[in-house]
């Protein structure tokens, strides 16, 4: 009953904000036990103390840990002489040396150590009997120094333990002397024991399996977490953490955190089978919740039932808990213990801020070897985390790895989900596999990836992590519009900084077998929000990486590796250039194919389709300038998606008809043609030669990897494809940078009216200055967005008009087509689709003016050729070979 009253008093005190220092048994910093010595060392120390009692200096007794730092004892020399102790001692006589040597031999035999070397001591002293006493003393001392190394090493170790213990006592005394407002309030709550509902938890003798420890954290800067005296229970138990996993969450439901923790618990069980049953002590999980008011009620209820959270206190928690998994009503199965740190932030700061706490506060204290990033809702397979860690253990040059992210239970009747399923599969099969061969993966997804902590950790404030968190440590005005957009894809910045780290040669790797299933946006509005953020951030991050290519000269990569990186980044530059004109290429594809089909048969329908298409593009520009994608604008986005999808499927059908249909081979101008689809049929011969194998590249690559499910989502992907290439996604701005302010209570006057008024005036002046600065920054971002959209629209229009009225298309397109064939060795999703669109535009334009093209392509097909499968890395490379006209 007294414990319950004590607990209630503590909870009430913490809620009122005036928590008193914890009781001695639950104090923040408990004095460490004195070092334990070996029994023989203890016996030797006792004898030495008794024999040298009058000659050794005495030390002042150690003060208690609750004293101030100035009260920490200092060893003082009480002997009033400037000479050393050895010089003050008389020289022993030879007979006494012999007696001392015999004593050493007997002592050595008693502690069961080899005494062969000690048997030489009496003999050496007998030989020196006729010599002077100092010579005998010197000989004996030399033998003692050379023969007692084992005992000396043990004594040295004991001395180191003693020094560590004294430093700990001094640190505890310093922390105990902190002002009352800085003392750490910590409370143990039997939530874990209550979660077992009367059953005895495993390892119930340890407090970490019975009690949850709550700590109210007042640190504003996460890097000062350890310096302010906060200690995680895992660190207090002196456990060396090898794998540190973070789960970032916002407002997800309890079922999502349940799935993620269950997947990690299964993975921990598998790692315990591989590394040993006690490996769970080297694994810890940190759950960082972004905002107390944003946390889901069902998620908090689940954590409360698990024993990782208590509704009464909103703090950072640290515990060790066994995760039960009830399989049926007759028995229960228990996973290995999972050490969980649940951090609930008071304010919403974003996912990047959650990573800031994980790396700069928790990881900096625990110093793990590997860190794993997981989003809540992502469910790793049983062996996924193990495979990520094993790949870095086998190759010490790998600094980061990424697994395969798959859609959890894709709904093929929902085109939004099915299109993302197809895109994820193709990206994993083609993009990441090939980038892994080069050693640089453009982005390691934050939903499921792992880093070697040594590779990204900052050294004296310099390293990948400070650049990764630059958008949090800098104001929006300091970043500017370019960097503000660039840090929408901070994952890409971290990968580039890891690759180009000075005097290092870190690489990245893709692990195909490490699969994690995640939930994807299910509505069109959510998909557009995600696409805007990803496309915008990747575009500006790509420009940043290309512009800072010279920093590779400071890394320690080999010359051949740097040449490969240069080639890869040159390709990325070309990809960014082509993606700039992606919208105009899509329009030209629709324009030429529809013109070939409907110029003579239905000119009014053709004019209406093209006019409506341009009107939709103009509407998207207006929405991009003024409104965010919200449910109120969902109807317009839905209409544009459906219309562009229908146009895409129509163009695809016309292209397939041109491949399999029968018709004349005559080439005529579509403006004077008679008969629908006549000109399209004229392309049959050239299209069938190149487009058929090109169409099978994606499917053949998928079949090599055993991904047969893409057949069920390919139609939905082509239907949604125009939605992914809306250039209005550019210049979205920044992701919550304007809301990054300092939190905490504000100070007021001491109670006098005059002081209160002055304080309020200062606060009002600060608010006005901050509001004016924010308005100026917003205006600069709006101007940047409007200017960029205007430039993009002008470039798209200019390219479309030039290609429509061009009569020398061989000069314009035959040169780039050779470059396309060269760079098509590297298969990329965005570039491949763009090249397909541009190739069909060239095919249609050449058919109108000059006849069949030299290298025709289809709008719905991607370049192909020989397929080279590298089984070691599971990378598929599409090699495109030009086909010359007969």
From Swiss-Prot:
GO annotation, cellular component aspect: plasma membrane
Superkingdom of source: Eukaryota
Primary localisation category: membrane
One GO biological process term: cell wall organization
Membrane topology type: Multi-pass membrane protein
Membrane-traversing stretches: 534-554, 578-598, 605-625, 636-656, 672-692, 695-715
Family assignment from sequence similarity: Belongs to the chitin synthase family.
InterPro entries per the UniProt record, alphabetical: Chitin_synth (IPR004835), Chitin_synth_fun (IPR004834), Chitin_synth_N (IPR013616), Nucleotide-diphossugar_trans (IPR029044)
PANTHER family according to UniProt: CHITIN SYNTHASE, CHITIN SYNTHASE 1
Chain positions covered by the region annotation Disordered: 16-37
Keyword terms of this UniProt record: Cell membrane, Cell wall biogenesis/degradation, Glycosyltransferase, Membrane, Transferase, Transmembrane, Transmembrane helix
Protein known as: Chitin synthase
Gene assigned in the entry: CHS
Catalytic activity: [(1->4)-N-acetyl-beta-D-glucosaminyl](n) + UDP-N-acetyl-alpha-D-glucosamine = [(1->4)-N-acetyl-beta-D-glucosaminyl](n+1) + UDP + H(+)
Location(s), subcellular: Cell membrane
EC number: 2.4.1.16
